[in-house]
Swiss-Prot record:
Keywords: Cell membrane, Cell projection, Membrane, Sugar transport, Transmembrane, Transmembrane helix, Transport
CDD domains per record: MFS_GLUT6_8_Class3_like
KW Lipid biosynthesis (keyword) present: no
InterPro entries documented for this protein: MFS_dom, MFS_ERD6/Tret1-like, MFS_sugar_transport-like, MFS_trans_sf, MFS_Trehalose_Transporter, Sugar_transporter_CS
Protein name as it appears in the record: Glucose transporter type 3
Annotated source species: Drosophila melanogaster (Fruit fly)
Length: 507
C-alpha cells in the first residue's frame, strides 16, 4: 500500500524450522534450530527514494555500455568512408571492430565473480571506470585499426562487467516487491545509451560525438554515491555499515533489526561449505538446475536476433530503401517495450511477459519472412514501411520479454552465495554467443533475407516453450521459495530438502 510516496514493507521471513518450509541446503539433525514461539511480523513503512537513487547510480555504467553498443551501428558509414579517422578499414576489419566489443565482454565477465566476492559490487563497479576511460580514449584518438580494436575491446570489458555486477547489486538491494522493476532498469539504461548514439548520429559528425562521449565519463564518479549491498557487509562482519546501507535504501526511520537478524542467522554446515568455496555448490542438484536454466535463457536471448538490429539496424534501413532518420521508429519500439516490462514485471510476473512477448516475436518474424519474400519478388516500395513497423514491434517485444528479463532471472534463479560465480559464467556464455552471432552475420549478406526472420521465429518458439516448461514464476518470492519452485517439468515443486541462503532482497 502507498500513502504519501511511502510503501508498506513486506515482512522479512524468519527462519523456519518446519520440514515443509522452503529450503536450499539439506539440514542435518544437529543443524536444526531450537523451537521457539514466533511473533507476528510487524509491517513498517519504507521510503524507496534511496533505492531509486542507488539503482540510478549503479546503471550509469550500463548507459555508457549502451552508447558503445549503439556506436557500432551508427559509426560504420563515417568510418568506412574515412570521414572521421585518418585510416579506412576494410569490411573485414570493421567486422572485427564490432566483434571485439562482444569478445571483450565475454572474457572480462569471468573474473567478475571473484571481484564481487572480495571487493563487493560497489567497488567492482567503480573499478570499471578505468577500462571505460581507456576504451573511449583509444576510440577518440585512434590512429590505426589496431588502436580502434583495443578501444572497442576495453569498452566491451567494461560492459561485460556491468552485465555481471549490476543485476546482482540490484537484486540484493531491492525489496521483493521492487526487485523486478529495479532489475530491468539495467536493460533500460543500455537502451537509452543505444538511442542516444543513434540520435547524436543524426545531428553531429562522428568526431564530435566521440569527444562528447568521452566527456560524458565525467558522470562516472557519481557512482561513489551508491551504497554497498547490506548483504556484503554482513558477510564480512560489518554490521554497522550494513545498517547504514539499509537506512539509505529503506529510509532513515527504517528499523533494520529484522532484516539484519535474517541476514546474520547461523548458516547451516552446507552453507558454510559453499561460502568457503563456491565451486562446491555445484554438487547440489538445484544449483546445477538453476545454472542450466540461466545458461539456456542467456543463449536464446542472443540468438533471438535483436542484437543484429542494434549492430546493423542502419544497414537494414538502407536495404529497405528508407532514410536513416526514420530509424527513430525502431527507437520508439525499444522504449515502449522497456516501459511495458518496467511497469508489468512486478504485476503480471516474469513468465507471462516472457510467454506473450515470445509469441509476439514468433508471429512478427513469420510475417517479416513472408513479407521480405513477397517484397523481393514483387518490388513494392510501399511494403518497406510495413516491414519497418513490424521490425519496431519485433524489438519492442524483445525488450519487453527476453531482452530485459534475462538479466533479472539470472540473479533470481541463483541463490546468493552462488550468484557471483554463477552470473559470471552465464554472462560470459551470453556474450560468447553474441560473438559467434556477429561473426556469422557479418560474414553473410542476409540482412533482408526472409530465411533470417524465419530462423528468429524458430528461436522465439523455443523461448516460448522453455518459459512454459522450465522457468518458474519469481515475482515477489524470496530466494528460498524460488528454489522450491525449481522442480521438474512444468516447474512442479520438488521435495523440499534445501534451506534458503541469506538473501537481503527478502525484506
Amino acid at each position: 500500500m502507498r500513502k504519501g510516496g511511502i510503501q508498506d514493507a513486506e515482512p522479512v521471513e524468519p527462519p523456519q524450522s518446519s520440514r515443509k518450509s522452503g529450503t536450499w541446503f539439506a539440514k542435518r539433525p544437529s543443524e536444526m534450530p531450537e523451537r521457539h514461539v514466533e511473533r507476528a511480523p510487524v509491517r513498517q513503512k519504507i521510503n524507496n527514494v534511496g533505492l531509486y537513487k542507488a539503482t540510478l547510480y549503479s546503471n550509469i555504467g550500463s548507459f555508457f555500455f549502451g552508447i558503445a553498443v549503439g556506436w557500432s551501428g551508427t559509426a560504420e558509414r563515417s568510418v568506412m568512408e574515412q570521414h572521421s579517422y585518418s585510416f579506412q578499414p576494410t569490411e573485414l576489419q570493421w567486422s572485427g571492430v564490432c566483434i571485439l566489443l562482444t569478445l571483450g565482454a565475454a572474457l572480462w565477465c569471468l573474473p567478475m565473480g571473484l571481484m564481487v566476492r572480495l571487493l563487493g559490487c560497489r567497488r567492482t563497479i567503480l573499478i570499471q571506470l578505468l577500462p571505460n576511460f581507456l576504451g573511449w580514449f583509444l576510440t577518440v584518438f585512434a590512429r590505426s585499426v589496431p588502436m580502434l580494436y583495443a578501444g572497442r575491446f576495453f569498452l566491451g570489458m567494461c560492459g561485460g562487467a556491468h552485465c555481471v555486477v549490476v543485476p546482482i547489486y540490484n537484486a540484493e538491494i531491492s525489496t521483493t516487491k521492487k526487485r523486478g522493476a529495479m532489475g530491468v532498469v539495467f536493460e533500460g539504461a543500455c537502451i537509452c545509451g543505444v538511442i542516444y548514439s543513434f540520435a547524436m548520429s543524426l545531428f553531429l559528425e562522428l568526431r564530435i560525438i566521440n569527444f562528447v562521449n568521452l566527456g560524458l565519463l565525467a558522470l562516472g564518479p557519481l557512482q561513489i554515491l551508491m551504497p554497498e549491498s547490506p548483504a556484503y557487509y554482513v558477510d564480512h562482519g560489518n554490521i554497522p555499515r550494513a545498517e547504514d546501507s539499509l537506512r539509505f535504501l529503506r529510509g532513515q526511520k527504517y528499523d533494520t533489526r529484522r532484516e539484519i537478524d535474517f541476514l546474520t542467522r547461523d548458516p547451516t554446515e552446507s552453507e558454510r561449505e559453499v561460502r568457503q568455496g563456491p565451486l562446491l555448490g555445484f554438487k547440489y542438484k538445484k544449483v546445477r538446475r538453476s545454472l542450466a536454466r540461466s545458461l539456456a535463457i542467456a543463449l536464446l536471448q542472443k540468438l533471438c536476433g535483436a542484437l543484429i538490429f542494434i549492430f546493423y539496424g542502419l544497414n537494414m534501413l538502407d536495404c529497405l530503401r528508407i532514410r536513416r532518420e526514420f530509424g527513430l521508429i525502431l527507437c520508439l519500439g525499444l522504449i515502449l517495450g522497456f516501459l511495458a516490462c518496467f511497469f508489468l514485471v512486478d504485476r503480471l510476473g516474469r513468465r507471462p511477459l516472457l510467454i506473450f512477448s515470445s509469441a509476439g516475436i514468433v508471429f512478427v518474424s513469420i510475417y517479416l519472412g513472408l513479407h521480405f519474400k513477397v517484397w523481393m519478388t514483387m518490388g513494392l516500395t510501399v511494403m518497406s514501411w510495413i516491414a519497418l513497423f513490424c521490425i519496431a514491434i519485433f524489438v519492442g517485444c524483445y525488450t519487453a520479454g527476453v531482452g530485459s528479463l534475462t538479466w533479472v532471472l539470472n540473479a533470481e534463479l541463483l541463490v546468493r552465495p552462488m550468484r557471483p560465480l554463477g552470473c559470471s559464467i552465464v554472462c560470459a556464455f551470453n556474450w560468447l554467443t553474441a560473438f559467434f552471432v556477429i561473426c556469422w552475420f557479418g560474414s553473410h549478406g542476409v540482412k533482408c533475407q526472409p530465411y533470417l526472420f524465419l530462423l528468429f521465429a524458430i528461436i522465439a518458439s523455443l523461448i516460448l516453450l522453455f518459459s512454459l516448461i522450465y522457468i518458474p514464476e519469481t515475482k515477489k518470492l524470496s530466494s528460498a521459495k524460488i528454489q522450491q519452485r525449481l522442480g521438474g517439468l512444468i516447474n512442479r515443486p520438488a521435495v523440499i530438502t534445501f534451506t534458503s541462503s541469506s538473501d537481503s532482497s527478502n525484506a
